[in-house]
């Protein structure tokens, strides 16, 4: 467990570090070098990230304040002080986002004949079409709810967009309120209008108006006989974190389902978003009805819920998007694709099973540059159909809908193989999906387990056991990312395919640890949390310190999502004091101060934000000239090291190790998506020097793969 106590001047608050990360995401939207529709995408990601941050992190801090907890975080801030600072940091970012939407995005889309219009900008023909559409496609699903002494304040669901209508009763003379929920789950946020109705010349490629405005300007149909005096939009965010204590739940699935029902009904409101021009009496009515305080209120200068800008990526305008990368099949696996026989691309006698290739060498996969479908999915598909395969075991943390991997596991069970799937039911915001997969797998004869009591299983591992010449051989995949067909195209992740006996035996014992009563305390090659990973990582860092103290080169390079563990940070400061060179590539939260005189002068931190979400974890240690490199599922966070099951594997093939070393070098030289962390914790985006070529690491990797997938 983490035990280091760092003074506030040595530790950056994790919540504020997260906001700095999301600010870098927003910067991608504001950067005019980013293609226009990708600007919309990054703005949507910024909003979506912020929703989850409020639902989990802000909700947790508010709960602490309500419980009277004043214990400071590692940087010396109480929960209340953190909440106030979060608000202070967010308000200017939200204004930047709205300014970009209004002054940049909409105007520049118009230059490309894409019209995102307000209702007031529609011509009479468009308004008539919208009114007709409202009557037959929107009106029937709306439910206006009155707010008065006879009608209690209606429940407002999490992340819902709503219309607050101000109604005047001509008979009584009373001014009343009503709430109408915008049916976003049933209808698109932006209503497409036939382009031929436009009076523009040339005709637009796409014309749309926000659904909430369509509803607002037709409220008279919802309140016949009444006078609609005004309408105002509002959006609510609720506490959505599930508090699950395994020891209190005999049936984890039942407990989760109850928790999910509670989440859908909604926890306490943690954020209320309203437009700047909402009258104070309407604001007061909402605040009282939703039981929110002034610090929970965010006044927004523009449309609410900009996460819906994701929908613009569907527009058929490739010139306004980053060039799409379809991925490649590694050359070494080119003849392992069953579909090539069906398509006549190779002869049946030319086919080579993926198992045959794995017996000859370790294979390093790098997604999305390497196709997930022709590598990891093909591995599991061939295992499901191969008569010599006796069993398949794997962990599932987040998988996609209509998952080919789930289908393969079911087929394997139907083919008589022993199949075990560890489905992590507690994967946040994927719980419902995972419950459905678990039930489907169980019905098909797959042994389904839910992991170790009190721990979340985050490791990404597959074990295939195959009978060969009366002996059993283990084939393994150990990765950094989820077995998810969709995110494999959006996230960068690494995976190792191997038949090394020690790795195979380690996975056999790790799965026994996950499914039985094993108290395994050591592994041959793997570093496993919560058993050996923390000790192993600390030992590797200390070894670099010893190398440096004895006059050899001490050098650490590590790439991960987040670095917030106090013990690891304290040890890295100790490494810096010994003059170990520490180069960190941290996409998200980083609580360490780099480059501080007398503390961390030899430590540098860079963050890469690009077309793909950087998700791979790599740990490289110079070891006095005999480097060792590891990949796996864990960040340097207390939860990964102590409260989750994680697996990190050494990459022992010299060629593959060299590939990873060159990959780290490529990231460190990036001058397009890279942000350098300063000694005060702020970030500055790198820019090419005059005459210097732009080095975008992700674009360079796409180019490398298009010219032939690296094999060594």
From Swiss-Prot:
GO cellular component, one term: polyphosphate kinase complex
Residues the entry annotates as binding ATP: 49, 491, 587, 615
EC number(s) given by UniProt: 2.7.4.1
CDD domains named among the record's database cross-references: PLDc_PaPPK1_C1_like (cd09165), PLDc_PaPPK1_C2_like (cd09168)
Organism for this UniProt entry: Parasynechococcus marenigrum (strain WH8102)
Protein name (database record): Polyphosphate kinase
InterPro entries referenced in this protein's UniProt entry, alphabetically: PP_kinase (IPR003414), PP_kinase_C_1 (IPR041108), PP_kinase_middle (IPR024953), PP_kinase_middle_dom_sf (IPR036830), PPK_C_dom2 (IPR025200), PPK_N_dom (IPR025198), PPK_N_dom_sf (IPR036832)
Protein family according to the UniProt entry: Belongs to the polyphosphate kinase 1 (PPK1) family.
Catalytic activity, as annotated: [phosphate](n) + ATP = [phosphate](n+1) + ADP
One GO BP: polyphosphate biosynthetic process
Pfam families, per the entry: PP_kinase, PP_kinase_C, PP_kinase_C_1, PP_kinase_N
Gene: ppk
């Amino acid at each position: 467990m983490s035990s280091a106590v760092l003074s506030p001047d040595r530790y950056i608050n994790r919540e504020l570090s997260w906001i700095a990360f999301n600010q870098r995401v927003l910067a991608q939207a504001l950067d005019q070098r980013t293609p226009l529709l990708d600007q919309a995408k990054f703005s949507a990601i910024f909003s979506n990230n912020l929703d989850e941050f409020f639902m989990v992190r802000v909700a947790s801090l508010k709960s602490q304040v309500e419980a009277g907890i004043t214990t400071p975080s590692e940087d010396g801030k109480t929960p209340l002080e953190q909440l106030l600072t979060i608000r202070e940091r967010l308000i200017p970012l939200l204004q930047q986002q709205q300014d970009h939407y209004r002054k940049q995005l909409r105007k520049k889309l118009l230059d490309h004949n894409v019209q995102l219009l307000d209702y007031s900008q529609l011509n009479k023909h468009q308004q008539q079409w919208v009114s007709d559409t409202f009557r037959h496609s929107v009106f029937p699903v709306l439910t206006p709810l009155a707010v008065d002494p006879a009608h209690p304040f209606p429940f407002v669901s999490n992340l819902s967009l709503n219309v607050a209508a101000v109604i005047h009763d001509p008979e009584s003379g009373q001014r009343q309120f009503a709430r109408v929920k915008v049916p976003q789950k049933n209808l698109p946020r932006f209503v497409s209008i036939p382009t031929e109705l436009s009076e523009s010349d040339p005709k637009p490629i796409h014309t749309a108006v926000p659904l909430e405005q369509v509803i607002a300007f037709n409220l008279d149909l919802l309140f016949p006989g009444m006078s609609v005096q005004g309408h105002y939009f509002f959006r609510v965010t609720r506490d959505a974190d599930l508090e699950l204590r395994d020891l209190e739940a005999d049936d984890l699935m039942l407990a989760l389902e109850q928790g999910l029902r509670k989440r859908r009904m909604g926890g306490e409101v943690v954020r209320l978003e309203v437009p700047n021009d909402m009258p104070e009496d309407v604001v007061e009515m909402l605040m009282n009805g939703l039981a929110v305080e002034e610090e929970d209120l965010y006044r927004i200068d523009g449309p609410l819920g900009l996460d819906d800008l994701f929908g613009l990526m569907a527009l058929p305008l490739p010139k306004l998007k980053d060039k799409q990368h379809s991925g490649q099949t590694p050359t070494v696996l080119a003849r392992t694709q069953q579909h090539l026989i069906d398509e006549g691309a190779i002869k049946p006698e030319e086919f080579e099973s993926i198992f045959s290739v794995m017996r000859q060498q370790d294979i390093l996969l790098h997604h999305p540059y390497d196709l997930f479908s022709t590598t990891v999915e093909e591995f599991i598909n061939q295992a499901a159909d191969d008569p010599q395969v006796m069993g398949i075991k794997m962990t599932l943390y987040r998988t996609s809908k209509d998952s080919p991997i789930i289908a393969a596991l079911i087929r394997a069970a139907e083919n008589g193989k022993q199949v075990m799937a560890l489905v992590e039911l507690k994967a946040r915001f994927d719980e419902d999906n995972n419950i459905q997969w678990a039930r489907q797998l169980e019905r098909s004869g797959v042994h389904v387990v839910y992991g170790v009591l009190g721990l979340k299983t985050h490791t990404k591992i597959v074990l295939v056991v195959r009978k060969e010449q009366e002996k059993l051989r283990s084939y393994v995949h150990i990765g950094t990312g989820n077995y998810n067909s969709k995110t494999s195209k959006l996230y960068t992740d690494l995976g190792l395919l191997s038949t090394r006996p020690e790795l195979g035996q380690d996975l056999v014992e790790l799965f026994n640890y996950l499914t039985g009563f094993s108290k395994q305390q050591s592994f041959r090659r793997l570093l496993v949390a919560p058993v050996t990973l923390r000790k192993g990582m600390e030992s590797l860092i200390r070894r670099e310190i010893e190398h440096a103290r004895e006059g050899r080169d001490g050098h650490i390079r590590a790439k991960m999502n987040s670095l917030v563990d106090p013990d690891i940070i304290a040890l890295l400061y100790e490494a810096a004091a010994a003059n170990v060179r520490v180069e960190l590539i941290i996409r998200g939260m980083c609580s360490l101060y780099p480059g501080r005189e007398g503390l961390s002068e030899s430590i540098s931190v860079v963050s890469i934000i690009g077309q793909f979400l950087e998700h791979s974890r790599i740990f490289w240690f110079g070891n006095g000239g005999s480097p060792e490199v590891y990949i796996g599922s864990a960040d340097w966070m207390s939860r990964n090291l102590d409260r989750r099951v994680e697996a990190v594997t050494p990459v022992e093939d010299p060629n593959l190790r060299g590939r990873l070393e060159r990959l780290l070098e490529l990231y460190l030289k990036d001058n397009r998506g890279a942000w350098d962390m300063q000694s005060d914790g702020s970030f500055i985006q790198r820019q090419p020097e005059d005459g210097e070529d732009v080095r975008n690491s992700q674009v360079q990797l796409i180019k490398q793969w298009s010219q032939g997938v690296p094999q060594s």
